[in-house]
Amino acid sequence: MGSFIPTLSTGGSSIVNSTPYGVGNWYHQQWVEAISGGNKFNPIRLYWQMHPERDINWYNDMATSLGPRRTAQEIDGDFLTSGHTVFDLTSIKAMEDMLSEQRVIETRMNGSLRIFEKPKPGTNYYIGADVSTGRAQDYSAFSIMDRSGEEVGCFKGKIPTDKFASLLVEFGHKYNNAIIAPETNDIGLAVTSDIQNIHKYTNLYYSTKILRKKGKSKPETEDIPGWLTTSKNRSVIIDELEEDIRNDDVWIRDPFFIQEAYTFIYDATNRPVALGKNKRSKGGEEEENGYTDDSIMAKAITNFIRKGKTKSTIVAPQ
């Protein structure tokens, strides 16, 4: 699906009509983009009540025949997900329904960058960033929030590390010298290094690493610029984001996040992961057909630091 797009670029129009079938696929992605103004499709939802020959008796008969899950999809027009999703689907659906009402005051890079609110004087802002590992299905992403949890800007796209660092610094300066927390694992270290050493940006978030050494009763500590993700703190920040979304303590406007949230599930070990991510082929190589969690991780980091939690503590092995 989508192979017709190059043909349409030379002229013509397209009407795509379907009942929702799953999430994260091409149709669902285009729908979410359309209601947020991110593409040229005009989203129209046609309800069964609009049909002149349908009444409540027809609906009840169909509901009995199809069952609740298929009724929701085929009759009510709801996108359904599979697996135990991390985020409350009622909350995510409410966010999706609000996308068409979101005001976007600036876009760049074909919609990869979206700004919703200008910086307000005297307001503290926070930027958390997830840095792409370079794999085909991996993106760099960031989110800008104020202390109250209102998201004022977001980005998700393919971008070299030096340009990503420049983009983060640009919006750090623009948003009142915001605290920037780039994930500093692996290739993310290059982004953090550029921010610190090339751009001389000083308002960086720091992680504290506790070094336990043999023969010493008192551990040593080391402050590391950027956000250092571990399996433990990853679960903590995702759990906090889930709770804040469920309790309406954070206002997310990012359509990329909503696309990812529908396919962000608990795996067999109860670990929150993007559906199909890190799945390995029979040959042992990582497959590139899974879904993404880049916007989710950027949001989780930003949400954590905007609460005034200025340092994350990591205990290093002996």
List the predicted regions and their residue ranges.
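Active-site-proximal betaalpha loop/short-helix elements
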Residues: 229
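PAPS-dependent sulfotransferase catalytic core
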Residues: 226
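Acidic/polar active-site rim loop that often engages polyanionic ligands
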Residues: 219-223
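RNase H-like, metal-dependent nuclease domains and their acidic two-metal-ion catalytic environment used
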Residues: 15-16, 21-25, 39-40, 56-216, ...
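N-terminal cationic and glycine-rich segments that engage phosphates or anionic surfaces
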Residues: 53
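Predominantly extracellular beta-rich ligand-binding scaffolds that present long acidic/polar faces
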Residues: 232
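Signature of the SF2 helicase/ATPase Hel1-core->accessory helical subdomain module
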Residues: 1-50
